[in-house]
């Protein structure tokens, strides 16, 4: 199986996701979105979709660098701001992140990365409260399945248009949308520290894991069939473990059911009944 087998009709995907954003924003009673613009492909695609769906005047991009962030990331974020003629703000998170770790021993890169992600979430939700807009998420399907993200950090949002697209499909959609090649072709990175790379952290490429996840989820192939395709068993076992172990990250907090109608389980909110005018 080749990664090209995951390709979609990206014109149709664009139409579906644009309609999704317009409809969900209206259902929630809002008109505009705010998102963190990192300079990476995921946030660039979400920003492009939001502008096409809602108009440039209804999209605010927030750049949130840390002192170790690469200059290239900021340049690529600004490239999207100029391309789309949207409003933007910049909030440096270095001071609050560094202050959090003052006097705390046993610091690790993982913990600092989580605090950075949650500091950015705080900024976005404060802007959301200030301006009366919704926060758009930028986590793709591959990241969500693997749990490669921070709960109540970069995984926090009100709407996420790309959460059902594998990373390889996000790249395909980016090409369709005309996202600058510099953003599509560079190595994926959360830019948490100098030289950090998603694929180095994970130990495999997005193309490799997207094919495996597609076989597991979309094709519903069993272990024996997947291994017969030439997938190494240790790779299969590790990815499966990541998907299973991180299920809790993909759910709202689990509620113990006591009554006949429990929020988030079997009680439908009024907004779900509203007609879209």
Curated annotation (Swiss-Prot):
* GO CC entries: cytoplasm
Which positions does UniProt annotate for ATP binding? 36-43, 138, 167, 189
Catalytically driven reaction(s): deamido-NAD(+) + NH4(+) + ATP = AMP + diphosphate + NAD(+) + H(+)
Keyword NAD in record: yes
Which major enzyme category is it? ligase
- Assigned keywords, A-Z: ATP-binding, Ligase, Magnesium, Metal-binding, NAD, Nucleotide-binding
Cite the binding residues for deamido-NAD(+).
118
The subunit field of the Swiss-Prot or TrEMBL record says:
Homodimer.
Query: What PANTHER family does the database record attribute to this sequence?
Result: GLUTAMINE-DEPENDENT NAD(+) SYNTHETASE, NH 3 /GLUTAMINE-DEPENDENT NAD + SYNTHETASE
**What biological function has been recorded for the protein in this entry?**
Catalyzes the ATP-dependent amidation of deamido-NAD to form NAD. Uses ammonia as a nitrogen source.
Q: Which family does it belong to?
A: Belongs to the NAD synthetase family.
Kindly provide the name given to this protein in its UniProt entry.
NH(3)-dependent NAD(+) synthetase
